[in-house]
Amino acid sequence: SGSDGGVCPKILKKCRRDSDCPGACICRGNGYCG
């Protein structure tokens, strides 16, 4: 398990905090995961 734990999926997703984002993505200043 966790084989893709260091990967940020290339999905445009709105967020307010890092935990809103899939994988290793973080919530960027533009309000989207990246």
UniProtKB/Swiss-Prot annotation:
One of its GO terms (molecular function) is serine-type endopeptidase inhibitor activity. GO terms for cellular component: extracellular region. It comes from the Eukaryota. Keywords: Disulfide bond, Isopeptide bond, Knottin, Plant defense, Protease inhibitor, Secreted, Serine protease inhibitor. Disulfide bonds join C8-C25, C15-C27, C21-C33. There is a cross-link at D4-G5 (Isoaspartyl glycine isopeptide (Asp-Gly)). GO terms for biological process: defense response; negative regulation of serine-type endopeptidase activity. There is a cross-link at D4-G5 ((2-aminosuccinimidyl)acetic acid (Asp-Gly)). There is a cross-link at S1-G34 (Cyclopeptide (Ser-Gly)). The record marks K10, I11 as: Reactive bond. The keyword Transferase does not apply. A cyclic succinimide probably forms by loss of water between Asp-4 and Gly-5, that can then rehydrate to either the original peptide bond or to a beta-aspartyl isopeptide bond. Three isoforms of MCoTI-II are detected, two with the parent molecular weight, corresponding to the unmodified and proposed isopeptide forms, and one with a molecular weight 18 Da lower, corresponding to a succinimide cross-linked form. This is a cyclic peptide. It is found in: Secreted. PROSITE patterns: SQUASH_INHIBITOR. Belongs to the protease inhibitor I7 (squash-type serine protease inhibitor) family. Inhibits trypsin; probably participates in a plant defense mechanism. The presence of a 'disulfide through disulfide knot' structurally defines this protein as a knottin. This is Trypsin inhibitor 2. It comes from Momordica cochinchinensis.
